[in-house]
A protein has these predicted regions:
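Conserved ATP-utilizing enzyme core subdomain
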Residues: 2-17, 22-23, 165-240
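Short, glycine- and charge-enriched coil/turn segments that flank and shape catalytic ligand pockets
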Residues: 14, 39-44, 66-74, 88-91, ...
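Alpha-helical scaffold segments in soluble metabolic enzymes
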Residues: 56-59, 63, 102, 132-136, ...
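Short beta-strand-loop/turn "lid" adjacent to the catalytic site in phosphate-handling enzymes
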Residues: 44-100
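Structural signal for hydrophobic packing residues in well-ordered secondary-structure cores
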Residues: 37, 61, 65-68, 107, ...
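Electropositive phosphate-/nucleotide-binding environments in soluble metabolic enzymes
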Residues: 23, 27, 43, 47, ...
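Phosphate-binding/catalytic loop of phosphoryl-transfer enzymes
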Residues: 89-94, 105, 109-187
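Glycine-rich nucleotide/cofactor/substrate-binding loop typically near the N-terminus or early
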Residues: 6-60, 64, 68
Length: 240
């Protein structure tokens, strides 16, 4: 939905978020990205969108640096996640759109990227940052707190003593946003206004909860490769 830019100062065990900006993606670019995700990915389309999104990100990073009267020397490195196209830790692969080399050339700043694939190569599920950050917070406040993060997909972090467990629990806003866009001409359910007018379909919920992923033991992660419109429509047919 947007390009999020956080400018933070990190010294030893101290993390201070100084500035944060959110730049909305225009509808045309979002549609192109979704087409690449869901349809056959021709190399030409992928290259064009890859370049377009990278140059757009570079532009917004430059805007934020200028906005807060910083210099490029103030930025030691840019952490870049890109936009996930395909996430299959079961196949030991995770691909994203966005070119870290081009981004580094445009900004003339060191760019650190490929967090997901590097984590998978190290035996993880390809989502290392949330768990590390939550573990950091627990050490600072000296309490064991469980974190549930509801983004496109939901992930949970549980810390106990020196052990931290983090994994995806299942879908969250992704399916809701998809439904709002297709059937209500809305980007998302603002303030839960649509949901508040309805009632829980217990039979549909029971059908969805039979999904094998929910019974799978951690470590595990998921994405739109499993939880997508076809998945929802399949369960609707079962209970109709």
């Amino acid at each position: 939905d947007s390009i999020d830019i956080s400018i933070a100062s990190i010294t030893g065990k101290r993390i201070l978020v100084k500035f944060f900006d959110e730049y909305k993606l225009d509808a045309a670019l979002k549609n192109k990205i979704n087409e690449i995700k869901t349809n056959s990915r021709s190399s030409n389309n992928l290259k064009k969108v890859n370049s377009s999104i990278t140059l757009l990100i570079a532009k917004h990073v430059q805007q934020s640096i200028s906005k807060y009267k910083l210099t490029y020397k103030d930025i030691h490195a840019v952490g870049f996640t890109g936009i996930t196209l395909n996430h299959r830790p079961d196949l030991k692969t995770s691909t994203f759109i966005g070119d870290p080399i081009l981004l580094s050339k445009k900004l003339k700043i060191t760019v650190v990227s490929d967090f997901r694939q590097t984590d998978i190569d190290a035996g993880g599920q390809g989502a290392p940052l949330a768990g590390l950050f939550h573990n950091y917070l627990n050490r600072i406040i000296k309490k064991n707190i469980t974190y549930l993060n509801l983004g496109g997909f939901a992930n949970i972090t549980v810390s106990h003593q020196d052990r931290t467990i983090s994994y995806d629990t299942g879908p969250a806003n992704y399916l809701i946003d998809l439904w709002c866009d297709k059937y209500f001409d809305m980007e998302y359910d603002i303030d839960g206004s649509l949901a508040s007018m309805g009632n829980i379909n217990i039979e549909l919920l029971k059908s969805m909860l039979k999904e094998k992923y929910f019974k799978k033991k951690y470590p595990k992660s998921t994405g739109f490769e499993l939880f997508n419109e076809s998945w929802v429509q399949g369960h609707l047919k079962k209970v109709s």
